[in-house]
Amino acid sequence: MPSQRIYTIRGQNGSATQHRKIQLSSYDANAQYQIVEFKIMPSGTPTNSDQYGIITMGKNDNVDPSSPDFSDQNQIAWAHHTVRQPVPPGIAESVVISNYEVNDEKMFAYDLWLHTEDVMGGKDVNWFLKIMRYSVGDVPASIASLRQYQYNPTE
């Protein structure tokens, strides 16, 4: 029976557009990774845009997200979700990206790119991402550079 571990990554985006890099420093080609949930919780009043945020995940071989040359055209996007109005401030909308297991080294060997876009008129957007890692046999399910959080669905 494969072991499993869930990582929850929380963040806050207060700028117009922000790119975040999550380093999978102990990637295991014999394991499977699955994005199980992404949730955005707006903390301000929405603008006239039709969305609160966008998440796009993929592997970028060429451009660092901190570079001004970074664009989604450089990404291989394999998961995408848009949070739309109306979502009252403080109420979270969640998405479960189910049955999407990644064990292709070319797609997932090095980095997971998390892109959140704040269209809240300068307001903060709180988000968290849950990554479930299935290990094979007794291989430790550890991703060294990810901070682990206790998942509280009421937050």
List the predicted regions and their residue ranges.
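Noncatalytic modules at the cell exterior or secretory-pathway interfaces
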Residues: 31-40, 104-122
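Extended, solvent-exposed segments with strong compositional bias
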Residues: 4, 61-107
